[in-house]
């Protein structure tokens, strides 16, 4: 489970108009939510205990022929799916147009409303490596699993780290594995979507691979503030049509960024209106 990041110094300039999001007010947790949350935390701990040896064995077995760590990463993304399926408070679904070939590489981008977005996006049926803040890799067990799965660390504000991360992203794409980036750089703390940064779009143009937009909705209530108990969440990740980059140059980064942001914003607003 990761928190995605973008290289420092790649801020976008797209204007962020005020959006109207759903009411984030969550009623007090009752006995049912307390029991369901306790059960879900137990499931999470059991899954971690099970996944650590499974991933270690998978890594060792596939190491000679899977330099992209596709299989060990694919196994890792299945853990959040199991955790969600056994959490009675959360209902997640994937909609939209899924890629015909999951091994075609994309730069995948999404809006970012909650830490739970990571668990939700893990439901998409293909493997991708996540560009993530380096401090996430320092979390005991979780950070080790991220490293084992081939996710890509980035130290914010460090140009050398940014260059190394972008080189890793290019390597992953050449091995026909997608890269996942939250172009806002961090979670939005309001109903507004932050401006997008340039990094993901520069990467897509340099690698000449399509941008695949995802839209997440409904995760803001999944975690309660200052409470160990979970909230009720009916969340959706929608897969949109890929945006091609053939023939584009680095001079087109800003236009591509703004186009993709507008697509995600429009679809997110439509999803909110449909759920209202």
Q: What is the predicted role of each segment?
A:
Residues 2-27, 31-35, 163-276:
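Non-catalytic C-terminal accessory region of glycerolipid acyltransferases
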Residues 2-106:
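Membrane-anchoring hydrophobic helices of lipid-metabolizing enzymes
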Residues 55-74, 78, 85-87, 102-159:
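Catalytic core of membrane glycerolipid acyltransferases/transacylases, capturing the structured
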Residues 89-91, 127, 148, 176, ...:
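A generic structural signal for alpha->beta connector loops
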Residues 94, 108, 130-131, 237-239:
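Generic preference for hydrophobic
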Residues 95, 131-133, 155-156, 183, ...:
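Thr-Gly-centered strand-to-loop micro-motif
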Residues 95-113, 162-165, 173, 266-267, ...:
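Alpha-helical membrane-embedding segments
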């Amino acid at each position: 489970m990761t928190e995605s990041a973008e290289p420092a110094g790649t801020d976008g300039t797209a204007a962020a108009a005020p959006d109207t999001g759903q009411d984030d007010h969550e009623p007090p947790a009752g006995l049912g939510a307390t029991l369901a949350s306790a059960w879900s935390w137990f499931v999470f701990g059991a899954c971690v205990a099970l996944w650590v040896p499974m991933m270690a064995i998978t890594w060792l077995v596939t190491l000679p022929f899977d330099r992209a760590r596709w299989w060990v990463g694919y196994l890792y993304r299945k853990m959040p799916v199991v955790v969600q399926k056994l959490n009675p408070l959360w209902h997640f679904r994937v909609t939209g147009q899924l890629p015909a070939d999951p091994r075609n590489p994309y730069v995948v981008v999404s809006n970012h409303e909650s830490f739970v977005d990571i668990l939700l996006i893990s439901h998409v049926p293909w493997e991708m490596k996540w560009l993530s803040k380096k401090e996430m890799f320092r979390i005991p067990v979780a950070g080790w699993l991220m490293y084992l799965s081939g996710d890509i660390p980035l130290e914010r504000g460090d140009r050398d780290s940014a260059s190394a991360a972008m080189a890793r992203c290019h390597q992953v794409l050449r091995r026909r594995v997608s890269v996942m980036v939250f172009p806002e750089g961090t979670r939005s703390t309001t109903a507004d979507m932050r401006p997008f940064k340039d990094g993901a779009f520069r990467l897509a143009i340099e690698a000449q691979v399509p941008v695949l937009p995802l839209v997440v909705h409904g995760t803001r209530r999944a975690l309660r503030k200052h409470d160990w108990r979970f909230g009720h969440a009916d969340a959706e990740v929608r897969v949109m049509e890929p945006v091609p980059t053939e023939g584009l140059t680095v001079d087109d980064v800003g236009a591509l960024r703004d186009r993709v942001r507008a697509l995600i914003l429009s679809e997110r607003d439509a999803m909110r209106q449909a759920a209202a």
